[in-house]
Structures are given as structure tokens and as C-alpha cells.
């Protein structure tokens, strides 16, 4: 193990003692926000300290087994122990490196997924619907809840734009992340190549959608919106909606005047419900704009493999005639497209997580 990594790990046992003391203090227990924050850190530090203790134990086992080699009667057993200890030490070092990687505090949050039809007209809208279905089905496989926040449906099916809210427990995504941590690398341009249902000559068409994944702000993160900065319009809902459709001005559009960012919702039955949902999405979009601007500045200094998540970055191609999905950022190609479109997205998300971890390890000089 590199000395730098070992020196980092040595600090965790001491930090664990400090956190144990803090969690026993009455003033900390009385402040629920601070108590939750310290408890979260305590869980992370406990995990690292525990794995490092195991690493040190296996180092001691290895040293003992090497001494046993000098005894002819014990040599065979010692050789087996040496092999087992060396194998586990390699695995533990890799695990510890990943546990020390900088964490994005937003990874544990719920997320909004915004899917917009792009080039390709009706076919693009149909593909936007396919993507929404793919994410919804994946969410179901890992026990997440999906709520449609707003939807602008196309006349022939699919969506011109749809916003989903996905809620789930932390630790259920790849590498133990939450919803946002699992899905954040889905942001960007998604291209589809297939024969549209309306194509009579059997020609393959190319169309595209853009996806933006935004963390849902919690009550402590949420920005305060000045009512003077908002323009709120009501209008009659359109599209699927049952008997109430077009009878009341229940749909709501909110414009944030300083930024020009817009959010609307017409899925709920009441104006109050639609306004609340629109404001939720608006807050997430404003924060995502600030986040994207920061990411763009960082990307100008260092162009990462995964990219900045900008909508203009073409990240993936879905080729239906070949049954192929290609993620261009990490040169991943899978020939199981139909299964992926049915929600079998885990392998793709895991590969992106591992690529990002490898990037971070390289930056820290650990690989």
C-alpha cells in the first residue's frame, strides 16, 4: 500500500473516537440537522475504519505465514495462507481506495429526470416516451418510486417533454449511491437509430432526445424564491386527463424572471397541486443551472471522461436494427438493447460509476 494512502487511513480511527464523543453530547442530539449530519459521517468513517482494521489484520496474518515457511511441517499450510492473505489484501486495498474517493453530497438525493424530444419530430417524441419508460422500469426493479411532475404529450404518443421525480433510499443505486448518484451520468444527448412506425420504405432514421438529471433540493438546500421574481400563469390542461380536461384553468406555468427558466405542470387535478409541483421543478432547474455553470468552468480546466452532463454532449446511441447500445464516453457497447429498454440498465450505470471512480483514482495518484 502506498504511504500516502496509509497515512490517510490512519486518521480514521481517531476521527471515529471524535464522532463517538460528539454523538454522545446532549446539545448535538438536540439539533436534529447536526445530529443527522454527524451520524452520516459516523457511518462512513466506521466503514472505512473497519475495512482498514481488516487490512491490518491480514497484513499481520501474511507476516506470520511467511515466518511459518521456515518450518517444513508447516510450509504447505503457510503457502495456502500466504496466497489467501495476498489475494484478500489486493481486494481490500482496492476497496479502501474507492472508499476514500471524494463524495458528491448530492448523490444520496432523490432526482428529477427531464427528457426532451430533439431532432426527429414525431419519432423523437416517441423515443422520449421510450426513455421515460426505460427509467421508470429500472426504478421499479430497485424499489424506487416514480412520479410524473409534468408531461407535454405528442399527438401520436410519446412526449415533447416529460419530467419525472424519482424517489428512493440511499444505498440502493450502483456503488451504494442514492437515486441522483445512480442516474446523474444519464445527462446528455441520446441518439436513436431505427425504422419509425410511420416509415413505409423501411429506411432507418436517426433522431435524438436530451436528458437532464437534477438532484432534488432538500428543505435545507432549497433556494428561497422571491415572489416578485416569479410570473405565474394558469391555463387549461391539454392531452390525456379525463373528464376535468379543458374545463378549468388548473394547469400552471411559472417563469423565473431573472433567469428566464420556466416550469409548468398540468398533471394534477387542482391548480394548487400543479403550482406546488411546478415550483419544485423550478427550484431544481435553477440550482441545476448554477451547477452546470460550475461544471462547465471545471471542464474547461479538465475535460473528464464522463463529461459535464451538458445537453449538447452526445453520450449514447441506441441502434435498434443491430440491437446495440453504445455509450461513447467509455466505449461501452452492449448487444442487449431490448432488455435495456425494458429497464435492464444496471450494467450500463455500473460501468459509468466504475469509469468515474477510475478517473478520480488517477487524479489522486492512486492508480
UniProtKB/Swiss-Prot annotation:
UniProt keyword Cytoplasm, yes or no: yes
In-chain residues carrying the UniProt-annotated modification N5-methylglutamine: 243
GO MF annotation: an example: translation release factor activity, codon specific
Post-translational modification note: Methylated by PrmC. Methylation increases the termination efficiency of RF1.
GO cellular component: cytoplasm
Gene3D superfamilies, per the entry: 3.30.160.20, 3.30.70.1660, 6.10.140.1950
UniProt subcellular location: Cytoplasm
Principal subcellular localisation of the protein: cytoplasm
Keywords annotated in UniProt: Cytoplasm, Methylation, Protein biosynthesis
InterPro entries membership: PCRF, Pep_chain_release_fac_I, Pep_chain_release_fac_I_sf, Prokaryotic/Mito_RF, RF-1
NCBIfam families recorded: prfA (TIGR00019), PRK00591.1 (NF001859)
Family per record: Belongs to the prokaryotic/mitochondrial release factor family.
PANTHER family per the UniProt record, alphabetical: LD18447P
Described function: Peptide chain release factor 1 directs the termination of translation in response to the peptide chain termination codons UAG and UAA.
Protein name: Peptide chain release factor 1
Gene encoding the protein: prfA
Amino acid at each position: 500500500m502506498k504511504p500516502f494512502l496509509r497515512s490517510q487511513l490512519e486518521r480514521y480511527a481517531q476521527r471515529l473516537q471524535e464522532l463517538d464523543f460528539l454523538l454522545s453530547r446532549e446539545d448535538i442530539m438536540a439539533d436534529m440537522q447536526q445530529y443527522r449530519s454527524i451520524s452520516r459521517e459516523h457511518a462512513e468513517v466506521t466503514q472505512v475504519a473497519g475495512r482498514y482494521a481488516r487490512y491490518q489484520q491480514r497484513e499481520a496474518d501474511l507476516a506470520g505465514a511467511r515466518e511459518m515457511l521456515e518450518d517444513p511441517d508447516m510450509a504447505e499450510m503457510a503457502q495456502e495462507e500466504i496466497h489467501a492473505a495476498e489475494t484478500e489484501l489486493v481486494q481490500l486495498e482496492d476497496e479502501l481506495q474507492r472508499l476514500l474517493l471524494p463524495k458528491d453530497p448530492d448523490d444520496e438525493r432523490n432526482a428529477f429526470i427531464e427528457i426532451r424530444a430533439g431532432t426527429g419530430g414525431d419519432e423523437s417524441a416517441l423515443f422520449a416516451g421510450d426513455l421515460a419508460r426505460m427509467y421508470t422500469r429500472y426504478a421499479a426493479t430497485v424499489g424506487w418510486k416514480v412520479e410524473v411532475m409534468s408531461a407535454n404529450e405528442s399527438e401520436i404518443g410519446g412526449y415533447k417533454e416529460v419530467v419525472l421525480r424519482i424517489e428512493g433510499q440511499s444505498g440502493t443505486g450502483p456503488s451504494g449511491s442514492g437515486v441522483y448518484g445512480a442516474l446523474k451520468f444519464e445527462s446528455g444527448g441520446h441518439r436513436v437509430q431505427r425504422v419509425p412506425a410511420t416509415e413505409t420504405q423501411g429506411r432507418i432514421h436517426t433522431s435524438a432526445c436530451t436528458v437532464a438529471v437534477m438532484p432534488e433540493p432538500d428543505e435545507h438546500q432549497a433556494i428561497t424564491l422571491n415572489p416578485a421574481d416569479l410570473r405565474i400563469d394558469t391555463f387549461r390542461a391539454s392531452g390525456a386527463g379525463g373528464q376535468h380536461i379543458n374545463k378549468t384553468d388548473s394547469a400552471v406555468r411559472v417563469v423565473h424572471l431573472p433567469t428566464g427558466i420556466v416550469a409548468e405542470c398540468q398533471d394534477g387535478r387542482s391548480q394548487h397541486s400543479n403550482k406546488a409541483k411546478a415550483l419544485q421543478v423550478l427550484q431544481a432547474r435553477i440550482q441545476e443551472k448554477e451547477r452546470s455553470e460550475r461544471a462547465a468552468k471545471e471542464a474547461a480546466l479538465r475535460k473528464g471522461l464522463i463529461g459535464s452532463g451538458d445537453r449538447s454532449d452526445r453520450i449514447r446511441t441506441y441502434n435498434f436494427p443491430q440491437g446495440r447500445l453504445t455509450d461513447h464516453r467509455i466505449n461501452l457497447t452492449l448487444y442487449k438493447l431490448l432488455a435495456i429498454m425494458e429497464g435492464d440498465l444496471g450494467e450500463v450505470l455500473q460501468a459509468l460509476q466504475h469509469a468515474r471512480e477510475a478517473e478520480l483514482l488517477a487524479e489522486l495518484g492512486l492508480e
